[in-house]
Every structure is written in C-alpha cells, then in structure tokens.
Amino acid sequence: MNNSQINLPLLKKGKVRDVYDAGKMLLIVASDRVSVFDCVLPSQIPDKGKILTQISNFWFAKTISIVPNHMISSDINEINIILKLGLDPQYYSGRTVLVKKCERIDFECVVRGYITGSAWKEYQKSGTVCGEKIKEGLKEAQKFPEPIFTPASKADTGHDENVSFAYMLSHMDKNLAYKIKDTSIKLYNFAEEYLKNCGIILADTKFEFGLIDGDLILIDEILTPDSSRFWDAALYKTGTNPPGFDKQFVRDYMEQTGWDKNPPPPAMPQSIALAAAKKYKEALSRIEKGSV
C-alpha cells in the first residue's frame, strides 16, 4: 500500500503513516512507503507497514509497565465498529491502529548504545556526539560505556536536526525533559536486554512522546526496523558498519547511488526492496519468538 483513502479528515500525510482525525482519537495507517534521509522514495517495501505495525504493537504491550502509550485498538473489526467505518480488512488489517489523541512533544528522543551512523561521522570530525564531548579512541560500532540520550528537533517535512540535551532543556519544562530522558533510556535498556536473546544488538533507536492531561505517553512507533538499528549479533564486530535487520540496508544503497540527499530521490530497485523486506520479516520473526 502506498496511499490510504478513508472517509475521515486527513490530518497529516507523513513520510510513512497517514494520520486521520477521529474526534478525540486518531486513526493511523502505516503504508509501505520508505523514507531515507528525510525523503520519501518513489518505491515501496512490500508489507512494510504491516511489519512495522506488528512490531510496534508487540513492544507497546511489552513496555506498558515502563510508560503508558497511545494504543486503543489494532483490530480492524473493532475499529470499524468504534468509528462506524467500513474499512476493507483485506486492505487495512494489520497496518491500521486507533490511538488516543495527545499533545505531541516536538523532539525525537534518540538513545544510542553504540557509536554509528551520523554519530560516528560527527565523532570522527570533532570528538563529539550531538555536541556532547565523548571519550577519545572509540572505534566505529563500539559500545558506549552507558547509553547516551541525543534528542533531535522534530520536523514534519525536511530534515530533523540533532540537538543537545541542553537545547531540549531550554525549550521545554525541565522536569518533563528529564523524565523523557530517563524514560527513553529505561525503554532502551529493557529492549536491549530482550533483543540479546533474539540475536539482535540494539545499536540505537528513537522514541516519540506526547502528553494527555499532563501525563507522559509513548506514541508513534517503537523499536521497529524504521526507528532503530538492529544489528545481527552473529556478524557484529567493531571497526565496521555491521549488517542487520533494518532500514540501514536501504540507506547504505542510496548513499552509493551518488544522490545528494535532496528531493527528488531516485527509485530503489526491486531487488533492494525485496531484500529489505526479507530483513524486516526476519526482525519480526526474531522479536516475536524471543529467540534466534
């Protein structure tokens, strides 16, 4: 699925998800669209939206004791009854969720357990990660002594921007900022421990939060191949860009094309899309089984 068509006001067509206004609730449909470097590619990954939704739903249930979340229902028949809609289960089942509407906090909350990606590039240049000084001598893909919290300012369109925690503190209630940081690291630590049994290293991940009546809740997606780097533990070694089960495979391909990371992006070959789909399915299988 590339686009959804539902008889509700479309609040936002995101990079991957279509968000509809359902009064005090939101209806979210995860498409098979692919976003890399904040640009939506003209190609899709088959069943990606269903896989992301299934993984998110798994983690929302697993982490409810750490932080409440926005979930109401992911059952398409129940959603049809609640909203008095006639959504075709063949088209919308598995990729559609009904959630609580909230006040979104406009920061992406990134937790990094290992140095890689943009953090590695910055570290090579300046010895910092998101402006924070990091100890010298780290190799690519090396584990940090402790997970680090590196927020990013949230952009609906264009590039999200890495910022320091000090910047975050200066742009919102300080107590709330510290609670978000603490909760993000707790979520990361919980997932990292669980994923060890799955043969997956959680290199880094991002969370998004909102407020309902002043209470912090977890929203959007959680611990998916789109929002996380999942490395194959069997193939991990420092000094490399370890292979895994996530969107990094597509990012790496797109970097090799010579594309300047500005719109419009080039198409992704079908062979790359199918290989990415296989990686996403492997992540889902391992996560649901709780083992390799």
Curated annotation (Swiss-Prot):
Q: Show the Gene3D superfamilies listed in the entry.
A: ATP-grasp fold, B domain, Phosphorylase Kinase, domain 1
Annotated membrane-spanning segments are: none
Enzyme Commission code: 6.3.2.6
Q: What Pfam families does this protein map onto? A: SAICAR_synt
Which ranges form a coiled coil? none
Which PROSITE patterns does the entry link to? SAICAR_SYNTHETASE_2
Q: Which CDD domains match?
A: SAICAR_synt_Sc
Keyword Ligase among record annotations = yes
- The answer to whether UniProt assigns keyword Ribonucleoprotein to this entry is no
- Provide the GO biological process annotations: 'de novo' IMP biosynthetic process
Report the protein name in the record: Phosphoribosylaminoimidazole-succinocarboxamide synthase
